[in-house]
């Protein structure tokens, strides 16, 4: 059994779920899985994956786990009560071997957003662990050696250069994830600020970290009053739910240009900062700082969070480039939790529909978008004033 607790997921799944409960409990959504790594035959392990999903759907939160969630300042009593009764339902999930693409799997999730939002992260962790335990021998000593070198590199930096673990969805295994976190905590001290994983935050006394994911802003392409106003509607909704708490805005759902047009003086003052998750991070940071300054907001009072494919070398270069012009935070994922030798999988589960309408992410990095509807992608680009997409190519890859 790979997943032992419903807390073994990223915090932002719970923070988004709370907002969904309070504001959009009837929303219906579709998610779709995609493996971007070529030549990966997941279909051969489909029965094993299915058994792990069955086990996941039998889990409920224990009383001490609900109490832990209640202890978080931003979790409201009614949401904790709801979670005490919650479980994932297999009826919302369909898993099959792909007939069109031998070796691939087709994994879709369809149902109420409130009841499906917690599927994504544990499903990705299950698929990763099933793959690696069947295709590689773990070299934990190599992983420890690499981790020690990363700790040494970070400790050579100023104390303000701090990282967090964001690696649940692409980890090598639950066991390795659980081993490396106390090593980081003890090795880095205050340079290790916490983890996105709620289960391990509880177990090791770490700070759980996270605010919102792409799906939250994507959903408002269908939930908001107008498509053009969808980002503003999503950010306003977040502000209503958290009243200034959890104030990191995600900037790349329809690209940085469109985001900055919507992120006006009100949002610049209200939110604590912004998160980078695609595109060139140095260019992104310079543009965000310039945007804040243009709105007479001191960037030194705001946090720039970097979380796109970071390794320790990139963390150090970003810190040296931007410090002390702003506050900085770094969420490191695969480079921490899946660096034992074997090549990590590039797998994702993305929302593709909400209330029957297509939704999409127009990433600042080519290849990171997923959408089933080419016409909608063109329309979305036009509405937000983005360059037309190329005529050729797979729309799911933009």
Curated annotation (Swiss-Prot):
InterPro entries: N/Namide_PRibTrfase, NAPRTase_N, Nic_PRibTrfase, Nic_PRibTrfase-Fam, Nicotinate_pribotase-like_C. One of its GO terms (biological process) is NAD biosynthetic process via the salvage pathway. Its EC number is 6.3.4.21. Pathway: Cofactor biosynthesis; NAD(+) biosynthesis; nicotinate D-ribonucleotide from nicotinate: step 1/1. The modification Phosphohistidine is found at residue 214. It is an enzyme of class 6 (ligase). Transiently phosphorylated on a His residue during the reaction cycle. Phosphorylation strongly increases the affinity for substrates and increases the rate of nicotinate D-ribonucleotide production. Dephosphorylation regenerates the low-affinity form of the enzyme, leading to product release. One of its GO terms (molecular function) is nicotinate phosphoribosyltransferase activity. It catalyses: nicotinate + 5-phospho-alpha-D-ribose 1-diphosphate + ATP + H2O = nicotinate beta-D-ribonucleotide + ADP + phosphate + diphosphate. Keywords: Ligase, Phosphoprotein, Pyridine nucleotide biosynthesis. It comes from the Bacteria. Pfam families: NAPRTase, NAPRTase_N. GO terms for cellular component: cytosol. Catalyzes the synthesis of beta-nicotinate D-ribonucleotide from nicotinate and 5-phospho-D-ribose 1-phosphate at the expense of ATP. NCBIfam families: NAPRTase (TIGR01514), PRK05321.1 (NF003704). Belongs to the NAPRTase family. This is Nicotinate phosphoribosyltransferase. The lineage of its organism: Bacteria, Pseudomonadati, Pseudomonadota, Gammaproteobacteria, Lysobacterales.
């Amino acid at each position: 059994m790979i997943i032992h607790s419903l807390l073994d997921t990223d915090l932002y799944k719970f923070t988004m779920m709370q907002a969904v409960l309070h504001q959009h409990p009837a929303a219906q959504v579709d998610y779709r899985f995609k493996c971007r790594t070529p030549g990966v035959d997941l279909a051969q392990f489909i029965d094993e994956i299915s058994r792990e999903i069955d086990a996941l759907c039998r889990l409920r939160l224990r009383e001490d786990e609900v109490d832990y969630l209640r202890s978080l300042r931003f979790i409201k009593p009614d949401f904790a009560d709801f979670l005490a009764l919650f479980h994932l339902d297999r009826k919302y999930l369909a898993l099959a071997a792909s007939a069109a693409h031998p070796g691939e799997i087709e994994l879709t999730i369809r149902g109420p957003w409130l009841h499906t939002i917690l599927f994504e992260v544990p499903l990705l962790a299950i698929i990763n662990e099933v793959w690696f335990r069947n295709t590689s021998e773990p070299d934990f000593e190599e992983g420890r050696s690499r981790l020690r070198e990363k700790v040494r590199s970070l400790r050579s930096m100023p104390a303000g250069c701090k990282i967090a673990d964001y690696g649940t969805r692409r980890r090598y295994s639950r066991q390795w994830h659980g081993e490396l976190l106390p090593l980081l905590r003890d090795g880095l001290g205050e340079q290790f600020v916490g983890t996105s994983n709620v289960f391990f935050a509880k177990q090791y006394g770490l700070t759980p970290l996270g605010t919102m994911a792409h799906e939250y802003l994507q959903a408002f392409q269908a939930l908001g009053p107008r498509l053009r106003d969808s980002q503003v509607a999503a950010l306003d909704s977040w502000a209503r739910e958290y009243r200034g708490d959890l104030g990191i805005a995600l900037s790349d759902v329809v690209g940085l240009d469109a985001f900055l047009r919507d992120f006006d003086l009100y949002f610049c003052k209200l939110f604590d900062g912004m998160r980078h998750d695609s595109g060139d991070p140095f260019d992104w940071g310079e543009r965000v700082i310039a945007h804040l300054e243009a709105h007479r907001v001191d960037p030194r009072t705001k946090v720039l969070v970097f979380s796109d494919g970071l390794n320790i070398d990139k963390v150090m270069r970003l810190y040296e480039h931007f410090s002390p012009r702003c506050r900085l935070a770094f969420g490191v994922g695969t480079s921490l939790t899946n660096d034992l030798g074997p090549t990590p999988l590039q797998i994702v589960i993305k929302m593709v529909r909400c209330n029957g309408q297509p939704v999409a992410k127009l990433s600042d990095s080519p290849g990171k978008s997923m959408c089933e509807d080419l016409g909608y992608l063109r329309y979305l680009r036009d509405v937000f004033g983005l360059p037309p997409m190329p005529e050729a190519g797979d729309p799911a890859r933009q």
